[in-house]
């Protein structure tokens, strides 16, 4: 493991919805890449316990998807609170990236950042204030290079 200020932290949250004032984080996953996007390490993937009342705020589509992929069962059986998940994630990140050096990287990351600010503030403060949002790159590609975007979109759909 090499701590390097140029390494990037990629994060993905699953939530019961998109409003941090109502909804909760139900899963957190991270990975580390170098500056050239080579994956260096996968971080912990942690289902976060939420009670049935909190889970009831999920819309039918979310509920169906997370039931089908097993996340609801993992949430109900999880021993992790938001705080414990935050500690475990930070412990992993410290092995690879110094505090305040990596932008927050991911897809539609501003939503994740809002949830971290509310429920995992120490983790949110671990990141640099900047962010690399893949959804921004997708939107720009769609507008500037639609042929390339559509070609990549087809490849992604075929893989899944």
Curated annotation (Swiss-Prot):
3'-to-5' exoribonuclease specific for small oligoribonucleotides. This is Oligoribonuclease. GO terms for cellular component: cytoplasm. It comes from Buchnera aphidicola subsp. Baizongia pistaciae (strain Bp). The keyword Nuclease applies. Keywords: Cytoplasm, Exonuclease, Hydrolase, Nuclease. The lineage of its organism: Bacteria, Pseudomonadati, Pseudomonadota, Gammaproteobacteria, Enterobacterales. GO terms for molecular function: 3'-5'-RNA exonuclease activity; nucleic acid binding. It is found in: Cytoplasm. The active site is at 129. GO terms for biological process: DNA metabolic process. The keyword Amino-acid biosynthesis does not apply. Residues 8-158 form the Exonuclease domain. The gene is orn. InterPro entries: Exonuclease_RNaseT/DNA_pol3, Oligoribonuclease, RNaseH-like_sf, RNaseH_sf. Its EC number is 3.1.15.-. SUPFAM superfamilies: Ribonuclease H-like. Belongs to the oligoribonuclease family.
């Amino acid at each position: 493991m090499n701590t390097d200020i140029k390494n990037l932290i990629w994060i993905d949250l699953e939530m019961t919805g998109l409003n941090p004032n109502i909804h909760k984080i139900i899963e957190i996953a991270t990975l580390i890449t170098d500056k050239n996007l080579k994956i260096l390490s996968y971080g912990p993937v942690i289902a976060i316990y939420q009670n049935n009342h909190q889970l009831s705020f999920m819309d039918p589509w979310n509920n169906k998807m997370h039931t089908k992929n097993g996340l609801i069962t993992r949430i109900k059986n999880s021993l992790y609170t938001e705080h414990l998940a935050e500690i475990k994630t930070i412990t992993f990140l410290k092995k690879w990236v110094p505090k305040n050096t990596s932008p927050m990287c991911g897809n539609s990351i501003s939503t994740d950042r809002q949830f971290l600010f509310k429920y995992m503030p120490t983790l949110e403060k671990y990141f640099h204030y900047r962010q690399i949002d893949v959804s921004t790159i997708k939107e720009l590609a769609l507008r500037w290079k639609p042929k390339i975007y559509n070609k990549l979109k087809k490849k992604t759909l075929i893989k899944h």
